[in-house]
Amino acid sequence: MKDCSNGCSAPFAGERGSEEVAETFRAKDLIITPATVLKEKPDPDSLVFGATFTDHMLTVEWSSASGWEKPHIKPFGNLPIHPAASVLHYAVELFEGLKAFRGVDNKIRLFRPDLNMDRMCRSAVRTTLPMFDKEELLKCILQLLQIDQEWVPYSTSASLYIRPTFIGTEPSLGVKKPSKALLFVILSPVGPYFSSGSFTPVSLWANPKYIRAWKGGTGDCKMGGNYGASLLAQCEAVENGCQQVLWLYGKDNQITEVGTMNLFLYWINEDGEEELATPPLDGIILPGVTRQSILELAQQWGEFKVCERHLTMDDLATALEGNRVKEMFGSGTACVVCPVSDILYKGQMLHIPTMENGPKLASRILGKLTDIQYGRVESDWTIELP
């Protein structure tokens, strides 16, 4: 078969017949260079999301010639990067987001990190970045957390955000699969994602002129380009007095995601059934870890129908007219659960009676998830820092 022009169908030159190429990195090979000057830890109550960083970071370099280098935990600092690196020109990159929580028993826990590692590998395939052993990456992250564990806030309203990032670093302006890459992990102590508070409802701006993702695209991958391309719509949402964008898709204005969140609708459906519904994973929805956890929790409860289905703005408007909507809320690692109170659509503000209804379900889900995350309830969804 003839090679495609971007080199996707052919192995790198350094991969042909070489037994020296390291197919993955190993946690046992970690090189640790401790920081000589440690920063002052911030007050958990004063944290701004993503603005403060810990003392150390993890880096692992890769090249087609030699494969993976040894992982390195080093003092937090700037990255040396070539001006022609593919990440800077063609957005060859991906990232993840997960959290470490200091429990009521002072133990540090991660919430379902295996799902983040799985998603990171799927995104790597889509971006043509090299594979690695996801269990080894998790071991390296745990070692990084062990070193910076005092940065995990002593608070049940704050956490330590973990940001693994994977970028193409080949110094070339050619549009092709990169022959060099860098995987790095940074840590940031965080409070509530939204400045208005962790459980204050948000308003949404829905306008079909902007589209977040489409079939065959990268909407189901956690890639920076998906977020950078959303900023103009987010600015317009704020100009219209709303806090987030409700992304629509197709001629029937299907409801997909909310800004940085998956979306749930708790309602009485067209058949008169009590139902918790969320858009399906059809290639344009990010498969959120919190989303999956909410679906599994609700299915375990068995108290109402739980459904992954397409929802349109007409479905929502009709349900609102019939007083069939109970709650709407977003979900995500950063926000956990966030109620929705209003949607601005076609010049009309649609009020969602989420807060008038408690919100009983959103509050229950938030309570259950945070009980697990902060160790108030034992669960196999968490792993403890050794």
Swiss-Prot record:
Modified residues (N-acetylmethionine): 1
Principal subcellular localisation of the protein: cytoplasm
Gene Ontology cellular component list: cytosol; mitochondrion
InterPro entries registered for this protein in UniProt: Aminotrans_IV, Aminotrans_IV_CS, Aminotransferase-like, B_amino_transII, BCAT-like_C, BCAT-like_N, BCAT_family
CDD domains, per the entry: BCAT_beta_family
Quaternary structure, from the entry: Homodimer.
UniProt name for this protein: Branched-chain-amino-acid aminotransferase, cytosolic
Organism: Mus musculus (Mouse)
